[in-house]
Amino acid sequence: MAVSSTTLSSPTPPECLQQQEAPRPPATRGRLVVLTGPSGVGKGTLVSQLRQRHPELYFSVSVTTRPPRPGEQEGVNYYFRTREEFLNLIEADELLEWAQYAGNFYGTPREIVFQKLSQGQDVLLEIELAGARQVRQQCPDAIRIFLSPPSLEELERRIRERGQDSEASIQRRLQQARKELDAKDEFDYVIVNDNLEQALQELEALLYPPSPGKGQS
């Protein structure tokens, strides 16, 4: 089955950027930020709040074979594709990274990411652990952040509170979460999401540190 490449076509990617923490002039490359954490830890909510405060940050919309949840929109939350279409994207090398999670495939369209970076725009990827490891191989200068729950028990409570998963699915997610938590030391930064506002402030401090001398008389 042919897959439309209107939004997912992929040229040969340029080299990855050098990590920079200070504000950059428009002519320089943007930063690639990778956010990873267990399902239910609050990545989506945190990203939504961050984007409201920093609309200049480009959020890369992932491709998935997961069925849309109520309220989700094509091209806004995800690009929804069949399994066959997704495999075609892999074969065509149109994905920067991809991984299988809870029986579904997830991946990041390659072209738009490098396009935004080359234009000097920061790009945020909210992806799974396996995908984050792939990005590390291709873009070692990416800023890698792990969002952790305060405890596994709290994570289970949040997943159950969503009311979207069967018991079998909850157990699979918790099993995967244990593996992901064991890998958090692979990341540059770890933020514990015990309080959303505090986690957001920590994330902002990492990505948008105050300019030297700001606030001083």
Swiss-Prot record:
Residues 1-30 are annotated as: Disordered. SMART domains: GuKc (SM00072). Pathway: Purine metabolism. GO terms for cellular component: cytosol. This is Guanylate kinase. Disulfide bonds: none annotated. NCBIfam families: guanyl_kin (TIGR03263). Keywords: ATP-binding, Cytoplasm, Kinase, Nucleotide-binding, Transferase. ATP binds at residues 37-44. The keyword Nucleotide-binding applies. It is an enzyme of class 2 (transferase). Essential for recycling GMP and indirectly, cGMP. (Microbial infection) Catalyzes the phosphorylation of dZMP to dZDP, when the bacterium is infected by a phage that produces the substrate for the synthesis of dZTP (2- amino-2'-deoxyadenosine 5'-triphosphate), which is then used by the phage as a DNA polymerase substrate. Belongs to the guanylate kinase family. It holds the Pfam family Guanylate_kin. Its EC number is 2.7.4.8. SUPFAM superfamilies: P-loop containing nucleoside triphosphate hydrolases (SSF52540). Residues 1-10 have a biased composition (Low complexity). Residues 30-208 form the Guanylate kinase-like domain. GO terms for molecular function: ATP binding; guanylate kinase activity. Transmembrane segments: none annotated. It catalyses: GMP + ATP = GDP + ADP; dZMP + ATP = dZDP + ADP. It is found in: Cytoplasm. Its main location: cytoplasm.
